[in-house]
Amino acid sequence: VGDVGSRRVGNFERSYEVFAGVVPPRIRNQSTPGADEAQRDLLEIACRHHGIGTAADLADYFRIGITEARPRLAELLEAGRLQMAVVDGWSDVAYLHPEAVRPRSVAARALLSPFDPVVWFRPRAERLFGFRYRIEIYVPELKREYGYYVLPFLLGDRLVGRVDLKADRANGRLLARGVFAEEGVDTGGVAFELSIELDRLADFLGLGEVVVGSRGNLAGPLRSVRR
């Protein structure tokens, strides 16, 4: 344990101070865990947050190597801290947290950051939602499938679309340059909910107008909703 700690104080800012001022006594006075114990604790936390996941899902959450994670997961199973599960359609076995609760309904609506845990581990997002997602900021413009900076749109318990967004701060506009619906969704309903979320985002960013472009299969329905 070092003598100096750091804490975030704002966007991309950190303050450095005496370690005792950063970490509370209940944490500071605990004994330092060994590597195996720390990995077990982190994997259990990952499973609690996921509810259920494969070994790869849980290992990725705290960037633990999969070869290190597998024996720790076996130990958690033996200790009763996790349970084994089988999910239809998954090729790998899954781990279930004993306290996991399946909600009867999910009333969610959000534009997700590319770094949101829902989509960060791409294999899990594709397995759970059938949603193939890649960041295309380093892809040459003519080779991009959806756009430069595309945000997934979560509605209820599904990823129903994606939007290529740009903040035009000079003109006070939020540009939805490309708007795409996933296959099989109600485009009218999705457009209505997405319109509300775009207004919320524009307000948060201090932009006075949302401008919808013509690219994407959801652009037309979204423009119709916003007339």
Where do the model's predicted regions map?
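Long, low-complexity intrinsically disordered regions
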Residues: 1-111, 116-119, 124, 131-135, ...
